[in-house]
Amino acid sequence: TEYEINLENIFSESLDFDHKIVQSACRDLQAYVDRDPACDHYVTPLLFYKGFQALQLHRICHSLWIRDQRYLARYLQSKMSEYYGVDIHPGAIIGGGVMLDHATSLVIGETAVVGDDVSILHSVTLGGSGLQSGDRHPKIANGVLIAAGAKVLGDIAVGEGVKIGAGSLVLESVPAYVTVAGVP
């Protein structure tokens, strides 16, 4: 039909447009091997880990987003959300060497930034804190660990090397190399 989507062409165009997609995917793959004790081989995330797969699809969606193909980016993101249970807005910027462990119920908002070498576990939200528009989501620096169920909300900065405990609610910026846990 005339509305058929040729994913192979979309992916090829995105990879041609942004060569960092493949570099980031390789770094992501290495992150799983290095940080996930259940990952016994490089092929495991490629075939079986929805966090890895969703992240790679996000990279394609983000490429479409910045090339102003926003309806297509949102469509693919919506399908990703339905299939994987992972909701990453196409506008979100995500570095390389990122591990989304399990990834079920993960939400990353439009203006969120995730640095390099970050580990995010399931049921994490990097979201806004209200109805404001514009820059409204967290900025996560390199080397951060965000444990299961944590909620990091608002236009705040989480410094390099921070560890956020499971189930924590973070509403204020966090300096580098500290551990935060709990609910304010």
Task: Describe each model-derived feature in a short phrase.
Residues 81-184:
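Structural signal for interior beta-strand "rungs" in well-ordered beta-sheet cores
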